Amino acid sequence: MERNTYWVMSRGRDWIVRHDDVDLASLPSRTHAVAVASNRAQADQPSEILILGPTGAIEERRTFGVDDLA
């Protein structure tokens, strides 16, 4: 089974939560966006959150559940 990947990234002044190339939420802070992504990822295991920094590089990765790739 593949991991479901949720992305957290900045866009202008907002922070976006994305999954399957769809914006799920636009939030005022990184903290809020990570919380929303974490809730969705916990409910959609196995999953991961990739948090992008201002340059677009992955700054942090969080995983939820166990999958065949572990």
Regions found by a protein language model. Name each.
Residues 1-23:
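Short aromatic-glycine-(Arg/Gly/Cys) micro-motifs in beta-strand/loop hairpins
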Residues 4, 57-70:
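A cross-kingdom feature marking charged/low-complexity
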Residues 10-11, 22, 53, 67-70:
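Eukaryotic scaffold repeat domains enriched in small/polar residues
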Residues 16, 25, 50, 62, ...:
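Intrinsically disordered, low-complexity regions of eukaryotic proteins
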Residues 20-22, 29, 63:
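Surface loops and adjacent helix of pleckstrin homology
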Residues 24-27, 57-59:
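Surface-exposed loop/edge segments in extracytoplasmic proteins
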Residues 27-45:
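A short, charged, amphipathic alpha-helix used as a generic interaction element across diverse proteins
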Residues 46-53:
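A short amphipathic beta-strand at an alpha->beta junction
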